[in-house]
From Swiss-Prot:
This is Large ribosomal subunit protein bL21. The lineage of its organism: Bacteria, Bacillati, Actinomycetota, Actinomycetes, Frankiales. The gene is rplU. Keywords: Ribonucleoprotein, Ribosomal protein, RNA-binding, rRNA-binding. InterPro entries: bL21-like, bL21-like_sf, Ribosomal_bL21, Ribosomal_bL21_CS. This protein binds to 23S rRNA in the presence of protein L20.
Length: 105
């Protein structure tokens, strides 16, 4: 069974046991996180109806905070000697998916 969840403006296809990096979330390592924005669930059949997805819960455990790849920014203006170099590394929260509950009895 897998689910498609939205976090940080991105969509992630997750299954139980998957480790996924999402935009930075608050929470200490070992804390439980609920991912409420479920867009699709695939079990015995694919579910994408909004009413049925309202009862679906995807739970995950915070593994830690990791940094993404270094991005180098270089601004340059011709004939003036202007150079500006800057770098950036985005922080991500690493999650391990612990459960997908469909809410069916």
């Amino acid at each position: 069974m897998y689910a498609v969840v939205a976090s940080g403006g991105k969509q992630h296809r997750v299954a139980v046991g998957d480790v996924v990096d999402v935009e930075l979330l608050s929470g200490e390592p070992g804390a439980a996180v609920n991912l409420p924005a479920v867009l699709l669930v695939d079990g015995e059949s694919v579910t994408h109806d909004a009413d049925a997805l309202a009862s679906v819960e995807v739970t995950a455990e915070v593994v830690g905070v990791v940094k993404g790849p270094k991005i180098r920014i270089h601004k340059f203006k011709n004939k003036t000697g202007y150079h500006k170099r800057q770098g950036h590394r985005q922080k991500y929260t690493r999650l391990k998916v612990t459960g997908i509950e469909t809410g069916k009895a």
